[in-house]
């Protein structure tokens, strides 16, 4: 505990410097207090202030000559009781929030020393309020009182300090300027760590110009609209209650009332019946000259009774007159009644309709109360739309409905979710940094401790996957027996359609009495135009089931048709938007399956599209290939029937088989790989290396090889559907699009370059994903080699053996060694290389690669693959 100190008079720069040093010393100790210690001090300080609410109120009125003692008692009581109640259980010390599952911890720290500028209008209640906030947050505070209210402000601060110290707070945790001056106020703002400024626009501007963080409020010019639907008794008496409270010195109090024409007379009658005085033309002019002098508020009227202000104006009104009301028309600043008046003086306007009332209120706020408070009285049940319009139009941070604004604005009196406060933020409209009622959170620095956590991963596949040679009829039975489907739309290519591949499907549909039609105009690289044409036929036929039959092209085209059929409003470019995390993407894919069930039947063993959420489509206008990805594109059912694979030609067998190899290798190396995808990838590779050469050589005579390859391709598809692919596919997509190579061939020409690239233990940049904590792809490739029994003692040797094994497999199935070998003209390749590189870099697959590629690195890999060189990347 710090040594006992008595407050030394602060009346000079030197004395203030000493006070700052003392408060900082005390705050340094206070910063180590526990929540229990702080809460004990907070309670004691609030209790002491509450007990002195009457003496402090009397002192304030006596010293300032403004306001009403009884109302200041309420303000003092409110500042102590409501602030204590609001924050008594709020954590402000140490760990205030913790979520161990997500690894997030929030730690509250004090800011330091608060400079508190106190207004003359609320000199004791604001001092209590700010001192309590500082104590609850373990901050020190130095108060700069208004010269006109310094004694009562200091008395309030002293009372809080005494109680706090007796409860265990460090001596000197609260201090003040005894002889306030502009010089000392500026100094206290510049030397503090944060400023709580409550006062006029000049003081608030000075706070924001001090170079220190400031929370300041400005002038209010609250308009209150009384709609024709309003409860007039409620509206008028609420406004009187608010406007007369402490003689109108709450900055949120009504300055103008705007009444709709239909109820204007009734409102005026009620005001008069309740003791308000309406000024005639002559009296109005006299009061105008009194309330505003040379464009500024006359300080002599602030917080005075209506009778006193009338007397200053040379107007006789009853001594018990509650409010002086001036019926005026102009909302321009040239109209004195349009200004903030901080006294029981009110402007009253007539509006022909609600829109005109909004216009008037809008102008009054713009000229003098941006950001502060606005008020409306209406039937909140039947006129909700008017509330919405009012809230939309008013540039104020507190929009009060059927509420006296003085009491309503400060919070917790007429709405119990609006935080209690005596410093009301006005947001950027009012030149403030805060747009809400100021509370303890604004005097805290919150540290966020974020522990590393790994992403939630999943494994997703079609609802049903039928496997086994000859399983097609059994699988299709469900369309009738389980789903009761009526109309099927078949998507395939011209070759498959012309050669009878759709006949087993249509025969089964005929047997079940299900009508169907087919679209067979799918190209090898399906275009958006083709997909749109198919979707147009779908819209006409209105199927409840879609069957995609073919290789990746047919299934990809069918997926796009499915989207365009179910959601014709969907924008293709939005669907093609890249994402880092599929669950956080900007574009949300529309919900699929509401019109049609989707079945995929592959006729080649390679793409895996039957079990993936991906589709590749080409924009025929630009030639750009777009890989789309979303789990809404995942087929509902996949039918892996080797009967459809038996007669695949050698070229297709080779290209699709090596495509499946790249799927499995990239899925195993991917940053998002899991135990589930690893098992599928390794299993697929084992099968492919054994059975692809047999399927290639023996064709339809080797049933076992064909069926094994069908299953392996689907397993690899499931692996990359969840682990995603990498830069090999990014590059292959663009190589195929630019130079019209089959997709599987493009992958085959690039995969070994990518393995070498990814296996670097010192990459220029590694991929970004929480699970991927260090470059370990070399070891992953070595694991593949081990699984395939390729030999080698080091990871480097094993990886080289994997590359050799892939080269040997490619040679066995007739894949050429280089891009150049496929007749791609060198000058054309080089001329388009930079564009191809940039598009490959921007491909959706790039982000999942374990080594994040630079464009120069992608370029070198393309060059190596073209020339068959081995230039290090």
List the predicted regions and their residue ranges.
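N-terminal Rossmann-like NAD(P)+-binding subdomain of aldehyde/semialdehyde dehydrogenases
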Residues: 2-105, 133, 273
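ALDH superfamily catalytic-core signature
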Residues: 3, 10-12, 128, 204-332, ...
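Short loop-to-beta-strand entry elements in the cores of soluble alpha/beta enzymes
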Residues: 27, 137-152, 213-227, 243-281, ...
């Amino acid at each position: 505990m710090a040594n006992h100190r008595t407050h030394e008079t602060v009346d000079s720069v030197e004395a203030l410097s000493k006070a700052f040093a003392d408060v900082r010393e005390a705050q340094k100790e206070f910063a180590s207090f526990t929540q229990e210690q702080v809460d004990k001090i907070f309670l004691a300080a609030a209790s002491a202030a509450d007990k002195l609410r009457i003496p402090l109120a009397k002192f304030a009125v006596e010293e300032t000559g403004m306001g009403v003692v009884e109302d200041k008692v309420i303000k003092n009581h409110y500042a102590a009781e409501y602030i204590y109640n609001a924050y008594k259980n709020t954590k402000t010390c140490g760990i205030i929030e913790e979520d161990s599952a997500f690894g997030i911890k929030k730690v509250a720290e004090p800011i330091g020393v608060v400079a508190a500028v106190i207004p003359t209008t609320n000199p004791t209640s604001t001092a209590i309020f700010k001192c309590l906030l500082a104590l609850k947050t373990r901050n020190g505070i130095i108060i700069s009182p208004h010269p006109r209210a310094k004694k009562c402000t200091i008395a309030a601060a002293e009372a809080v300090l005494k109680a706090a110290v007796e409860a265990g707070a460090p001596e000197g945790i609260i201090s003040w300027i005894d002889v306030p001056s502009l010089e000392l106020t500026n100094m206290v703002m510049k030397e503090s760590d944060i400023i709580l400024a409550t006062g006029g626009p000049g003081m608030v501007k000075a706070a924001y110009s001090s170079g220190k963080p400031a929370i300041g409020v400005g002038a209010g010019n609250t308009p209150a609209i009384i709609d024709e639907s309003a409860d007039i008794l409620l509206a008028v008496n609420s406004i009187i209650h608010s406007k007369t409270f402490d003689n109108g010195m709450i900055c949120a109090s009504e300055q103008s009332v705007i009444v709709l024409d239909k109820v204007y007379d009734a409102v005026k009658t009620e005001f008069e019946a309740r003791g308000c005085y309406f000024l005639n033309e002559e009296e109005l002019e006299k009061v105008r000259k009194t309330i505003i002098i040379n464009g500024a508020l006359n300080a002599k009227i602030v917080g005075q009774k209506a009778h006193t202000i009338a007397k200053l104006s040379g107007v006789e009104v009853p001594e018990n007159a509650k409010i002086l009301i001036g019926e005026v028309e102009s909302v321009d600043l040239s109209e004195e009644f349009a200004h903030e008046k901080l006294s029981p003086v009110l402007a009253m306007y007539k509006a022909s309709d609600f829109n005109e009332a909004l216009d008037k209120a809008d102008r009054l706020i713009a000229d003098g109360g941006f950001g502060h408070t606005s008020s409306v009285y209406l039937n909140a049940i039947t006129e909700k739309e008017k509330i919405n319009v009012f809230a939309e139009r008013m540039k104020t941070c507190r929009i009060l409905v059927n509420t006296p604004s003085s009491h309503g604005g400060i919070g917790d009196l007429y709405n119990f979710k609006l935080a209690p406060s005596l410093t009301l933020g006005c947001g950027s409209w009012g030149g403030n940094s805060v747009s809400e009622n100021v509370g303890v959170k604004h005097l805290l620095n919150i540290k966020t401790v974020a522990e590393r956590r790994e992403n939630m991963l999943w494994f997703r596949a079609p609802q049903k996957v039928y496997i086994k040679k000859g399983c097609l009829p059994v699988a299709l039975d469900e369309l009738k027996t389980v789903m009761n489907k009526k109309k099927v739309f078949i998507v395939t290519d011209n070759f498959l359609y012309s050669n009878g591949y759709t006949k087993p499907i249509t025969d089964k549909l005929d047997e079940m009495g299900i009508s169907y039609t087919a679209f067979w105009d799918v190209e090898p690289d399906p275009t958006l135009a083709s997909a749109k044409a198919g979707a147009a036929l779908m819209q006409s036929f209105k199927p409840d089931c879609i069957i995609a039959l073919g290789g990746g092209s047919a299934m990809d085209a069918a997926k796009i048709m499915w989207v365009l059929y179910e959601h014709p409003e969907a924008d293709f470019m939005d669907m093609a938007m890249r994402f880092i995390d599929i669950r956080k993407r900007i574009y949300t894919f529309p919900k699929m399956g509401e019109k049609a069930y989707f079945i995929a039947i592959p006729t080649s063993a390679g793409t895996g599209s039957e079990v993936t959420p991906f589709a590749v489509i080409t924009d025929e206008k630009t030639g750009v290939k777009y890989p789309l990805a979303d789990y809404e594109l995942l087929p509902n059912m996949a039918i892996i029937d080797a009967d459809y694979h038996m007669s695949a030609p050698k070229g297709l067998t080779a290209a699709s088989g090596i495509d499946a190899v790249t799927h499995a290798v990239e899925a195993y190396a991917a940053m998002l790989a899991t135990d589930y995808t690893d098992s599928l990838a390794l299993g697929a590779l084992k099968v492919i290396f054994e059975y692809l050469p047999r399927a290639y050589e023996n064709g339809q005579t080797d049933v076992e090889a064909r069926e094994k390859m069908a299953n392996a391709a689907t397993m690899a598809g499931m692996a990359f559907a969840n682990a995603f692919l990498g830069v090999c596919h990014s590059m292959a997509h663009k190589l195929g699009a630019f130079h019209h190579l089959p997709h599987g061939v493009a992958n085959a020409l690039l995969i070994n370059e990518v393995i070498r690239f990814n296996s670097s233990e010192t990459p220029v940049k590694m991929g970004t994903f929480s699970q991927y904590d260090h470059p370990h792809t070399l070891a992953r490739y070595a694991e593949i080699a081990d699984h395939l029994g390729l030999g080698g003692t080091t990871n480097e040797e094993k990886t080289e053996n994997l590359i050799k094994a892939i080269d040997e497999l490619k040679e066995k199935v007739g894949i050429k060694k280089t891009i150049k070998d496929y007749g791609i003209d060198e000058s054309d390749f080089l001329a388009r290389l930079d564009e191809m590189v940039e598009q490959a870099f921007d491909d959706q697959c790039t982000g999942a690669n374990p080594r994040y590629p630079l464009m120069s690195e992608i370029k070198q890999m393309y060059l190596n693959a073209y020339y068959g060189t081995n230039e290090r990347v």
